[in-house]
């Protein structure tokens, strides 16, 4: 079963930041500078975590993966032109 996740990161080195960004572009929808919305299976989530661990320096970088409830409402304040299909938005 596929579940939604919010992946947020703070990478201290520009090279690692670019590598994580390029990797994440293939995994989810880029919704803010260092934030991606992903819909993943358990296997895809596990593989994504393993790959991210290879790309970051665990002492200096911070990556957080938040599970989101299915069918959750999303509030977008400000410019909201980056909403993925299937995500409901209320104003």
UniProtKB/Swiss-Prot annotation:
Its cofactor is Mg(2+). One of its GO terms (biological process) is maintenance of CRISPR repeat elements. InterPro entries: CRISPR_associated_Cas2 (IPR021127), Virulence_VapD/CRISPR_Cas2 (IPR019199). Disulfide bonds: none annotated. It comes from the Bacteria. It is an enzyme of class 3 (hydrolase). Transmembrane segments: none annotated. Its EC number is 3.1.-.-. CDD domains: Cas2_I_II_III. Mg(2+) binds at residue 10. It holds the Pfam family CRISPR_Cas2. Keywords: Antiviral defense, Endonuclease, Hydrolase, Magnesium, Metal-binding, Nuclease. GO terms for molecular function: metal ion binding; RNA endonuclease activity. Belongs to the CRISPR-associated endoribonuclease Cas2 protein family. CRISPR (clustered regularly interspaced short palindromic repeat), is an adaptive immune system that provides protection against mobile genetic elements (viruses, transposable elements and conjugative plasmids). CRISPR clusters contain sequences complementary to antecedent mobile elements and target invading nucleic acids. CRISPR clusters are transcribed and processed into CRISPR RNA (crRNA). Functions as a ssRNA-specific endoribonuclease. Involved in the integration of spacer DNA into the CRISPR cassette. Homodimer, forms a heterotetramer with a Cas1 homodimer. This is CRISPR-associated endoribonuclease Cas2 2. It comes from Thermodesulfovibrio yellowstonii (strain ATCC 51303 / DSM 11347 / YP87).
């Amino acid at each position: 079963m596929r579940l939604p996740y919010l992946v947020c990161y703070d990478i201290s080195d520009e090279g690692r930041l670019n590598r994580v960004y390029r990797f994440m572009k293939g995994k989810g929808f880029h919704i803010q500078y260092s934030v991606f919305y992903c819909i993943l299976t358990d296997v895809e989530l596990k593989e994504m975590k393993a790959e991210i661990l290879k790309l970051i320096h665990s002492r200096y970088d911070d990556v957080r993966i938040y599970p989101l409830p299915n069918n959750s409402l999303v509030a977008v304040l400000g410019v909201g032109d980056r909403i993925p299909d299937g995500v409901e938005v209320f104003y």
